[in-house]
Amino acid sequence: MKKTRTANLHHLYHEALPEDVKLTPRVEVDNVHQRRTTDVYEHALTITAWQQIYDQLHPGKFHGEFTEILLDEIQVFREYTGLALRQSCLVWPNSFWFGIPATRGEQGFIGAQGLGSAEIATRPGGTEFELSTPDDYTILGVVISEDVISRQATFLHNPERVLHMLRNQLALEVKEQHKAALWGFVQQALATFSESPETLHQPAVRKVLSDNLLLAMGTMLEEAKPIHSAESISHQGYRRLLSRAREYVLENMSEPLTVLDLCNQLHVSRRTLQNAFHAILGIGPNAWLKRIRLNAVRRELISPWSQSATVKDAAMQWGFWHLGQFATDYQQLFAEKPSLTLHQRMRQWA
């Protein structure tokens, strides 16, 4: 009898884990991973020990690239995404994540907080957060376990102050030269060990790399400070409104929601909702609702854990009752017919 796969494809897993369960990546071989991706669902699964759900917001064929190094309780990576995304993320527990965006190009957001040239994102492990990233976006990531920070606290002059910021801030303002130095160090490490991954099998090499990374991080964090956002209060409120709207849509998958439903649930007028979507995303709430639902259908079609056996099953589950129009809208967003998406899953996981 074939085993049935089950999973929630549209929400992250938040159940409390026993204290003796450790999810910290710790490896001595297979330290380096490189991947090229052509689908947002596939790309969201690339980062070791993370939970992620991505929604593709701009139409086109997605292209992503990902490189990571796994050290002893430290994770370093570079992520490139070709199209604008909305991301739900959850880092492995008992750690701190640092997101270091490029200093040039259109900025991304963590929650309602913009990430400019002198800013980095940060979140404790086990805490869900949301990223919004534009087309053609590169971000570096560093994840350090709390145990490493505790054992190596000397790399911070004032660890209590820094830890307080890391636990309570979505983003930090840092000196541009410190951010640039860390960016260069991480890029060089990724390039070097991607070409010679076997070098990281040596404990001495891993130790030197880890220690130098901690020193570079310490230099940046010592002079970091909370951000006083330049974005207007109204725009920050709009971003929070969009986040609440998405959660409501995904929590009510049994019925096709409308703009009126969103207004009633979020206690805002239609004009406020329109203003929020146009100010932040440049599209109306109707178009956004359709894209979020199309992304949900795509996860149902492509995931090996899906229970949907046909395109019709997946489409009807998310309120697309006119299958011809659904297929047209799906192909416009993902540059691919829904039947092809399902065929790829069946061929790979049959």
Swiss-Prot record:
Gene3D superfamilies: Homeodomain-like
SMART domains assigned to the protein according to its UniProt record, in alphabetical order: HTH_ARAC
Stimuli inducing this protein: Part of the 17-gene eut operon transcribed from a single promoter, positively regulates its own expression, induced by ethanolamine and adenosylcobalamin (AdoCbl, vitamin B12). This is the last gene in the operon and has a second weaker promoter that is constitutively transcribed at a low level. Subject to catabolite repression; expression is substantially lower during growth on glucose than during growth versus succinate. Catabolite repression is overcome by adding exogenous cAMP to the glucose growth media.
InterPro entries: AraC_XylS_family_regulators (IPR050204), Homeodomain-like_sf (IPR009057), HTH_AraC (IPR018060), HTH_AraC-typ_CS (IPR018062)
Reported phenotype of the disruption mutant: Mutations prevent expression of the entire eut operon. No phenotype during bacterial growth in vitro. About 10-fold outcompeted by wild-type in mouse intestines at 2 and 4 days following oral infection. Loss of induction of pathogenicity island SPI-2 in mouse macrophages. About 25% reduction in survival in mouse macrophage assays. Bacteria growth is not enhanced by exogenous EA in macrophage survival assays.
Listed GO biological process terms: ethanolamine catabolic process; regulation of DNA-templated transcription
Pfam families according to UniProt: HTH_18
Statement: the UniProt record of this protein carries the keyword Nucleus: no
A molecular-function term among this protein's GO annotations: cis-regulatory region sequence-specific DNA binding
The keyword DNA-binding belongs to this UniProt entry's keyword annotation: yes
Segments of the chain annotated as binding DNA: 260-281, 311-334
Alphabetical UniProt keywords: Activator, DNA-binding, Transcription, Transcription regulation, Virulence
Entry superkingdom: Bacteria
Stretches assigned to the HTH araC/xylS-type domain: 243-344
Biochemical pathway: Amine and polyamine degradation; ethanolamine degradation
Protein purpose: Activates the transcription of the eut operon, allowing utilization of ethanolamine (EA). Positively regulates its own transcription. Probably binds EA and vitamin B12 as effectors. Competes with ethanolamine ammonia-lysase (EAL, the first enzyme in the EA degradation pathway) for adenosylcobalamin. Ethanolamine-associated signaling mediated via this protein, but not EA degradation, impacts S.typhimurium survival within macrophages. Binds the promoter of ssrB and eutS in vitro; in mouse infection models binding to ssrB probably induces all 4 operons of pathogenicity island SPI-2. Expression of the eut operon allows this bacteria to use ethanolamine (EA) as a carbon, nitrogen and energy source. It relies on cobalamin (vitamin B12) both as a cofactor for the ethanolamine ammonia-lyase (EAL) activity and to induce the operon. EA enhances bacterial survival in macrophages in a concentration-dependent manner, suggesting it is an important nutrient in infection.
PANTHER family given in the database record: HTH-TYPE DNA-BINDING TRANSCRIPTIONAL ACTIVATOR EUTR, HTH-TYPE TRANSCRIPTIONAL ACTIVATOR RHAS-RELATED
Protein's recorded name: HTH-type DNA-binding transcriptional activator EutR
Organism of origin: Salmonella typhimurium (strain LT2 / SGSC1412 / ATCC 700720)
